[in-house]
Amino acid sequence: MKVLFKLPPSLRSELKKPVGELIEGDIPTPYLKVKDILTNEDPLVTVGDVVTENIMKVGLNPNLAIYDHKTERREYKPNIRSVEGVLITVKNPPGTITLPLLKAIKKAYSLLSHGKRVHIVVDGEEDLATIPAVLYAPIGTTVIYGQPKKGIVLIKVTNECKRRCAKIMRRMEVVRNGD
């Protein structure tokens, strides 16, 4: 059975509010601001092509990177180094969180616990992947995602962050068998 969580219009404005700390500025300013803070973060998770590319440009290597070769719904070819570790490809349509994406993120954290680095390449869209990336993350994980036209958001995963993401997931529309 095909199951996915679909973003209802009523949640769109809520998702525009940063879940963590907003680091404002044009590229590369936000990345340079957080570089020293993130140098010893483990695990470090990036969501988005521009975020992953720029974190790598400042010399950091995320343990888990989730991206879709798009930015703001336009094709984008990020300059992302190949990963020494595991590459997972998963389908996830825009505005959704699919069961395969959830499973891929859960598997990625399991692989991270065994010292592997993981890149998840999404065929479709990864914009909502921050939600399950926080839900499945161990407490203390650092998750970074982009805030369009503003900068980047830095999340230090806590139980409170997990509760907020779980609340958002519960408010999403559950679709079975594509109906």
From Swiss-Prot:
<feature type="binding site">
    <location>
        <position position="49"/>
    </location>
    <ligand>
        <name>GTP</name>
    </ligand>
</feature>
<feature type="binding site">
    <location>
        <position position="126"/>
    </location>
    <ligand>
        <name>GTP</name>
    </ligand>
</feature>
<keyword id="KW-0418">Kinase</keyword>
<keyword id="KW-0547">Nucleotide-binding</keyword>
<feature type="binding site">
    <location>
        <position position="51"/>
    </location>
    <ligand>
        <name>GTP</name>
    </ligand>
</feature>
<keyword id="KW-0342">GTP-binding</keyword>
<keyword id="KW-0808">Transferase</keyword>
<dbReference type="GO" id="GO:0016301">
    <property type="term" value="F:kinase activity"/>
</dbReference>
<comment type="similarity">
    <text>Belongs to the GTP-dependent DPCK family.</text>
</comment>
<feature type="binding site">
    <location>
        <position position="68"/>
    </location>
    <ligand>
        <name>GTP</name>
    </ligand>
</feature>
<dbReference type="Pfam" id="PF04019">
    <property type="entry name" value="DUF359"/>
</dbReference>
<dbReference type="InterPro" id="IPR054930">
    <property type="entry name" value="deph_CoA_kin_Thcocales"/>
</dbReference>
<dbReference type="InterPro" id="IPR007164">
    <property type="entry name" value="GTP-dep_dephospho-CoA_kin"/>
</dbReference>
<protein>
    <recommendedName>
        <fullName>GTP-dependent dephospho-CoA kinase</fullName>
        <ecNumber>2.7.1.237</ecNumber>
    </recommendedName>
</protein>
<comment type="function">
    <text>Catalyzes the GTP-dependent phosphorylation of the 3'-hydroxyl group of dephosphocoenzyme A to form coenzyme A (CoA).</text>
</comment>
<keyword id="KW-0173">Coenzyme A biosynthesis</keyword>
<feature type="binding site">
    <location>
        <position position="70"/>
    </location>
    <ligand>
        <name>GTP</name>
    </ligand>
</feature>
<dbReference type="GO" id="GO:0015937">
    <property type="term" value="P:coenzyme A biosynthetic process"/>
</dbReference>
<feature type="binding site">
    <location>
        <position position="50"/>
    </location>
    <ligand>
        <name>GTP</name>
    </ligand>
</feature>
<comment type="pathway">
    <text>Cofactor biosynthesis; coenzyme A biosynthesis.</text>
</comment>
<dbReference type="GO" id="GO:0005525">
    <property type="term" value="F:GTP binding"/>
</dbReference>
